[in-house]
């Protein structure tokens, strides 16, 4: 009998300590108190650029295996539409396959 009373009392103490009251102040990063404004930017959904043109996203480049890739010209980063990934024919074929998969998951219309 005493053991059951001790277990019940311990459970009640744990419940009181574990659940804070409604009057307590919100924590600094509390998800219920913090509000965020999300800005949705319009992005290109259809292709408008050919191989060699400057781009920002894969959706801008026309072609199933064409992606917006990064090259370095004179130490400066330049993004342009490209489909060639290597001078080796086998590696280039594998690269085009990877580009095709990347474009498939870009969800361009």
From Swiss-Prot:
Question: What keywords are assigned to this protein?
Answer: Disulfide bond, Ion channel impairing toxin, Knottin, Secreted, Signal, Toxin
> Listed GO cellular component terms?
extracellular region
State one molecular function term (GO): ion channel regulator activity
First-listed, main subcellular location of the protein, grouped into a coarse class? secreted
UniProt tissue specificity:
Expressed by the venom gland.
Where in the sequence is the signal peptide annotated?
Answer: 1-18
Residues of the propeptide = 19-46
Q: Where in the cell is it found?
A: Secreted
Q: Which cysteines are joined by disulfide bonds?
A: 47-62, 55-68, 59-108, 61-81
Q: What is known of its domains?
A: The presence of a 'disulfide through disulfide knot' structurally defines this protein as a knottin.
| Similarity comment text for this entry | Belongs to the neurotoxin 25 family. F7 subfamily.
Q: What does this protein do?
A: Putative ion channel inhibitor.
This protein's name: Hainantoxin-XVIII
């Amino acid at each position: 009998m005493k053991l059951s009373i001790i277990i019940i009392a311990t459970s009640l103490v744990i419940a009181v300590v574990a659940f804070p009251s409604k009057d307590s102040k919100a924590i600094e990063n509390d998800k219920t108190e913090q509000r965020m404004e999300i800005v949705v930017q319009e992005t290109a959904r259809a292709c408008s650029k050919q191989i060699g043109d400057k781009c920002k996203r894969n959706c801008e480049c026309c072609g199933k295996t064409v992606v917006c890739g990064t090259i370095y010209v004179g130490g400066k980063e330049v993004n342009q539409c490209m489909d060639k990934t290597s001078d080796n024919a086998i590696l280039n074929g594998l690269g085009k396959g990877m580009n095709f998969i990347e474009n498939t998951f870009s969800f361009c219309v």
